[in-house]
Amino acid sequence: MQHIDYLNLKDINSPLQQDILDAIHQVVESGWYLQGKANQQFAEAYAQYIGTQYCIPCGNGLDALKLMLRGEMELGRLHEGDEIIVPANTYIATILAITECRLKPILVEPRWETLQIDDRLLHQVLTPLSLIHI
């Protein structure tokens, strides 16, 4: 039986290898692994690319989700106890971000065909406290 690589990152990254190594070298040489020049340049370029004024680089998805939810709370759009609808097959970071912000995750089973929330089930979970779907 022939082996087929799931995601051959070596082949994918091969054309960019020297650029990647150069970028890593520049960051290591600068001594700024967090909040350095490369981070600032990325944030500015990404904000421009997606058409927004600001970009906040995060170390992981959990931190990004918490910042988003806390921002919505600071703006008064979310309040402790509000419900956030998520697919039951979501990654644990989604649930952790919601609960750390004292919000309530509402898990909805996904459709087998798409692995996305089964919209036919939403009427069973929607309440006046259901405000966001992640």
Task: Give short role names for the model-derived ranges.
Residues 1-32:
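N-terminal "arm"/small-domain region of PLP-dependent enzymes with the aminotransferase-like
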Residues 8, 57, 86:
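Small/polar loops that bind or transfer phosphate-bearing groups
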Residues 12, 31-34, 107-109, 114:
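Pocket-edge positions in alpha/beta enzyme catalytic cores
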Residues 32, 37-83, 97-101, 107:
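Phosphate-binding glycine-rich loop
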Residues 73-132:
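PLP-dependent aminotransferase-like
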